[in-house]
Amino acid sequence: MPGINGAGPSNFFWQWRTDGEPVTEREHDSSRSASSANSPEFPPPASPAESGRQRLLRSSALSRQTREWLEATPARVQGATPPAEARQSPEAQQAERIVQELVRGGADLNNVRTMLRNVMDNNAVAFSRVERDILLQHFPNMLMTGISSDSVLANELRQRLRQTVRQQRIQSSTPARLADSSSGSSQRSLIGRSTMLMTPGRSSSSSAAASRTSVDRHPQGLDLESNEVLRRLTQEGVDMERLRTSLGRYIMSLEPLPPDLRRALESVGINPFMPEDLSLVDHPVLNFSAALNRMLASRQTTTNSPELPPLASSAESGRRRLLRSPPLLSGQREWIEQNMRQEAEPQSSRLNRAVRLAVMPPQNENEDNVAYAIRLRRLNPGADVSRVVASFITDPAARQQVVNDIRAALDIAPQFSQLRTISKADAESEELGFRDAADHPDNATSCLFGEELSLSNPDQQVIGLAVNPTDKPQPYSQEVNKALTFMDMKKLAQYLADKPEHPLNRQRLDAKNIAKYAFKIVP
């Protein structure tokens, strides 16, 4: 019975047969010629022209000029016809030049490859400024119309990027790299992806674990760009703590930036304006905010001296001297002590003494009203939202909007326990690229809204937010859900409370449908 047809190195077709099957004479002759042509002991026969030249060179004595001409002829013929590997299409040559430009610019080639695929699939993208500028030179309509999946140049570029990334991984497979990959793994311009190795011995919990995409908000090239911007702002005397607070409020609540900070950002090439047609994840401010948070978190305080109490005002000093003076009437002493207590108490506290909570720490500088109210409610179980808001907002007209935002955020928070899960091992795969801050303190994954993420942080609910929704029983799939962006669900809830819009695609996102987009990361 005939077996499987195939072709040998010399393009002779051969056929597998069973032992009891007869072989015709014609097939015997063809198989003999095929085996002789494929035999490793005998090289393939030379062309007739080459054989003729060899016979002529071995013939009777030739003149020196004739012999030199014959010996040089094969070299001229070979040089005139380049091998197949050297004959590249114009698009392939241009793709090679693009890769070289990206390498010289310090771009993350793996991120460019992933983002190029996203552009061609009409998905969310996150290019660094260097990557974007280089690609716009060759794809000038990329920002307006994207890149067609039928583009010959784009497909050649994807293939060349894939080959280069594979070569880089092979070259970087040093013991130090292997040690780093075994401990966990390695998420991205000022827009925040990186390459890493899958931990040996880890098993995937689903068939989709091998085809996932993530956004890395601080690759090496982008970190250098962000650090340069931060250095210039520091030299200009910008208050970085104030800048972080203002950026956080702008990202979370769209509160306008102070004019001086807006001008400072524009002077270093960052346009803080957020147009309506640009999703949050695509805005350059996000990656800059992540870099700013990392810089400030890395600063360590060097002073251990206790803070000196503030100097008392002249009026307060006078009252204290009066209390130490010769005996006063009891009514006078009580009036002075009450007056001193009122002076020491902040005005907002005096106005809200009737609704003051049992536990009420001061509001942090970088904490908006919604976040502060949620923290107070957690510290005062059973306290009504309206009472919590009234405890620190003195203007009754401004309270209702904050109350509405808090209730919207509180509706989203309980959904965390109902989300579908992705294991930490799968999240740390090459395609997703999650890096826990506890395992990678110098290269941790940053939340979409700034701070670094860790499953061991009790104040965070780490999730991956997908671009496309799927019903709850289905596991994560890169083909269906597309890109996955890591963030703290508590921060996302605060953002959605003010603006119920998906930060990746601007679709509506609220407590009713968040379970279709979000995946909980579990140890």
From Swiss-Prot:
Chief location of this protein within or outside the cell: secreted
CC terms in the record's Gene Ontology section: extracellular region
GO terms classed as biological process: symbiont-mediated perturbation of host programmed cell death
Induction: Transcriptionally induced by HrpL.
Keyword check for Secreted: yes
Biased composition (Basic and acidic residues): 18-31
Sequence segments annotated as region (Disordered): 1-94, 165-223, 299-320
Family (UniProt): Belongs to the HopAB family.
Name of the protein in question: Effector protein hopAB1
Originating organism: Pseudomonas savastanoi pv. glycinea (Pseudomonas syringae pv. glycinea)
Chain's gene name: hopAB1
